[in-house]
């Protein structure tokens, strides 16, 4: 491993020990904000520190085994130990390289999830409902909280569009690769001839930004309309114009929120989604420029980005970005998504490593 990388790892290991000591300080325990920030930093440094300690131990093992090679009686055992230690050292170096990759500052944040029915009419709306249920199940398995911000139901079930906020540890980092087009191939319930139809939905995942980081939005650039809520919520829902529609005139982005009974709360929710959408559009533009020389696994949430196909007759799910096909569709639709998310996270890390080595 390069001396510069070892020096960086030593500094991170020292910082890990320093933060550990600070977390036991009574003054810091009393300051909740500082304590939370240091706890987050400690958690982020723990894996690197642990892996580096293991790597250092393996270097000692290699040195000991090399010294034993001079002893004829110990040579055979030493050669075996040396081979094992070198293998382990290589594995740990690969892990450390991944752990040192630049982190996306948004990865630890909550996220807004939008699922929209695309081509396919009623069947697309039903599939949007299935996708939202799949993500909700996945969130449940990770103990994340799902809060519906806005929804427009399909005429025969499902959703024309649904927006939810998902809160918990590392939500955006885990779900960000879901943005893009999702295609379904199945026989709709309304199909009497048993023909397979293809429908599509788009998914967009955006990080929730703290208020201080929301893009500056000029109030003059906003058109705010109020209207009466529709859908579930009891009689009260339809008695006041509590639902809000905000249009950002420069970009044409429209956000509706009618989940709360209070117009004020709906407006606050809609503005936070609007800020996230504007930020996501700016980020996508920047990433497109950066990724012009290499592929970008992060979809834009556009229907032209074809992420996955869910083929019900064959029980098959295919991720087109990494040519991964699994015949485990039932499990996927029940929210067991790690088997699809993990390979694409690893592929993304491999791309980042390749880009770093090109720079070097």
UniProtKB/Swiss-Prot annotation:
Chain positions covered by the region annotation Disordered: 284-313
Any matching Pfam family: PCRF
Keywords of this entry: Cytoplasm, Methylation, Protein biosynthesis
HAMAP family: Rel_fac_1 (MF_00093)
Record-linked PANTHER family: LD18447P
Protein name: Peptide chain release factor 1
Lineage of the organism: Bacteria, Pseudomonadati, Pseudomonadota, Gammaproteobacteria, Enterobacterales
GO molecular function: translation release factor activity, codon specific
């Amino acid at each position: 491993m390069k001396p510069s990388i070892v020096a960086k790892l030593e500094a991170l290991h020292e910082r890990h020990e320093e933060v550990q000591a600070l977390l036991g300080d009574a003054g810091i325990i009393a300051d909740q904000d500082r304590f939370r920030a240091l706890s987050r930093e400690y958690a982020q440094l723990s894996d690197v520190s642990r892996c580096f300690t293991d790597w250092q131990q393996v270097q000692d093992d290699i040195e000991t085994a090399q010294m034993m090679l001079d002893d004829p009686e110990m040579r055979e055992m030493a050669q075996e130990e040396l081979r094992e230690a070198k293998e382990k050292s290589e594995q740990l170096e690969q892990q450390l390289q991944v752990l040192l990759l630049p982190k996306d500052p948004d990865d630890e944040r909550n996220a807004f999830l939008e699922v929209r029915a695309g081509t396919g009419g009623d069947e697309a709306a039903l599939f949007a409902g299935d996708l939202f249920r799949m993500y909700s199940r996945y969130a449940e398995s990770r103990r994340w909280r799902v809060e519906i911000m806005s929804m427009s139901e399909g005429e025969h079930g499902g959703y024309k569009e649904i927006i939810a906020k998902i809160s918990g540890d590392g939500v955006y980092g885990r779900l960000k690769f879901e943005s893009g087009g999702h295609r379904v191939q199945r026989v709709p319930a309304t199909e009497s001839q048993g023909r397979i139809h293809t429908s599509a939905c788009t998914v967009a995942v955006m990080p929730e930004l703290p208020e201080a980081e929301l893009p500056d939005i000029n109030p003059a650039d906003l058109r705010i309309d109020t209207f009466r809520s529709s859908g579930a919520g009891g009689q009260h829902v339809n008695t006041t114009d509590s639902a809000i529609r905000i249009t950002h005139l420069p970009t044409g982005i429209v956000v509706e929120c009618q989940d709360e009974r209070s117009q004020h709360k709906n407006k606050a929710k809609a503005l936070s989604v609007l800020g996230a959408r504007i930020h996501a559009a700016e980020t996508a533009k920047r990433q497109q420029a950066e990724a012009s020389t290499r592929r970008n696994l992060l979809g834009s949430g556009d229907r032209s980005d074809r992420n996955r196909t869910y083929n019900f007759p064959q029980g098959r799910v295919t991720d087109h970005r990494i040519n991964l096909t699994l015949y485990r569709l039932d499990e996927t639709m029940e929210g067991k998504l790690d088997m699809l998310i993990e390979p694409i996270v690893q592929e993304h890390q491999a791309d980042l490593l390749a880009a770093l080595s090109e720079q070097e």
